[in-house]
Each structure stands twice: as structure tokens, then as C-alpha cells.
């Protein structure tokens, strides 16, 4: 396809895939607590579809990288664990420290569990005090962003020295 040719021509290291169907990421009227939740059967089917797509992308010479994300079906550490268990090794992972921490996950534990699948990293930090005061039954993802939930590494609460060292320890 023309899009795949463009990625290759630009020498992109991978295609980042972030789910947008049925998500509330761009809806300022949708509280964080209303995000789409997949049941076990839906997660199995989703994992299978993502694996097939990742295999196709790899066959085109362009690896995929799945991006877990706030306000999307795969947001939390537990949801990511279930997706990784229900998808094939052909589906690589984009590890996003900021989104995982925002979702309440243990970023170092996620790296330890899924390091073999990580092929791309986003290094955004979080402001823990902003996230802690959010009322997830009222605040949307965009409200959180506007309030300053995310920031650059070193300006927030995550220990990026530990994160980078942990990633580097796996190669």
C-alpha cells in the first residue's frame, strides 16, 4: 500500500498501532471511568486480530508496535498482561512509561514481564499530584492532559534512570 511504502521510504523503525475504535481519548465529555472494557472473549479475538496484522506488517518488512494507552481498551497493567497472553509473539509492544504509570501500573514490573516483546519506547513522565487529584468518574482523558498529567522525563514522578537501566538490562 501507499502508506506502507511511505513508512519504508521514511525509514520508520516501526508502525505504532494505538487503538482508536470505541475509545474515549478524544471525548472531553467521557470520564476516564467510562472507557471501553473488553471481556475475555473480546480480548482473545482482539489479540488474534492484532497478531495477524503484526504478522502481515512484518511480512512487508515493517514491524508493528502495539501502544497501550489511557482511555483505550488496553490501558492497565492487568489488561496489557491479558492481551500479551492472548496474542502471538509476532505482536511487539510499545512500552509507554507515562501511560502505564497513569493507569496505575508498575512500570518496572511491566518491563520485566514483557521485555521480550518491547520494540519501541515512549518516554513521557507523569505528574503524580495531578493524577492523584483526578476524579476519574468526572474527568476525561483530555481534562487530565490539559491539567498537566503528562510532562517530559525528569519533570515528573517517574524514575527514568531506573526505567532506562531496566530496559537496557534486557538489551
Task: Locate predicted features.
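Short, intrinsically disordered, charge-balanced linker/junction segments flanking boundaries
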Residues: 1, 143-145, 156, 166-171
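Active-site acidic/histidine proton-transfer and metal-coordination neighborhood
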Residues: 2-93
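Short amphipathic alpha-helices and their capping/turn segments at secondary-structure boundaries
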Residues: 2-13, 106-119, 161-169
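Context-gated lysine
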Residues: 8, 35-37, 49, 113, ...
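Broad hydrophobic/π-residue packing in well-ordered secondary structure
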Residues: 14, 98-101, 160, 171
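Short, small-residue-rich loop/turn micro-motifs
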Residues: 19-21, 125, 171
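Glycine-rich S-adenosyl-L-methionine
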Residues: 43, 155-162
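Acidic/histidine-rich catalytic cores of soluble enzymes
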Residues: 51-152, 157
Amino acid at each position: 500500500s501507499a502508506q506502507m511504502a511511505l513508512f519504508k521510504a521514511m525509514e520508520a523503525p516501526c508502525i505504532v498501532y494505538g487503538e482508536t475504535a470505541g475509545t474515549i481519548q478524544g471525548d472531553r465529555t467521557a470520564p476516564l471511568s467510562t472507557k471501553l472494557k473488553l471481556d475475555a472473549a473480546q480480548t482473545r479475538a482482539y489479540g488474534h486480530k492484532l497478531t495477524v496484522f503484526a504478522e502481515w506488517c512484518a511480512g512487508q518488512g515493517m514491524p508493528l508496535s502495539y501502544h497501550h494507552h489511557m482511555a483505550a481498551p488496553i490501558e492497565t497493567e492487568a489488561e496489557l498482561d491479558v492481551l500479551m497472553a492472548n496474542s502471538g509473539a509476532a505482536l511487539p509492544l510499545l512500552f509507554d512509561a507515562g501511560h502505564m504509570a497513569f493507569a496505575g501500573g508498575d512500570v518496572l514490573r511491566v518491563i520485566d514481564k514483557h521485555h521480550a516483546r518491547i520494540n519501541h519506547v515512549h518516554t513521557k513522565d507523569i505528574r503524580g499530584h495531578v493524577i492523584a487529584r483526578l476524579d476519574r468518574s468526572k474527568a476525561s482523558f483530555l481534562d487530565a492532559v490539559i491539567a498537566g498529567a503528562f510532562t517530559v522525563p525528569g519533570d515528573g514522578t517517574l524514575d527514568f534512570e531506573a526505567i532506562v537501566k531496566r530496559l537496557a538490562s534486557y538489551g
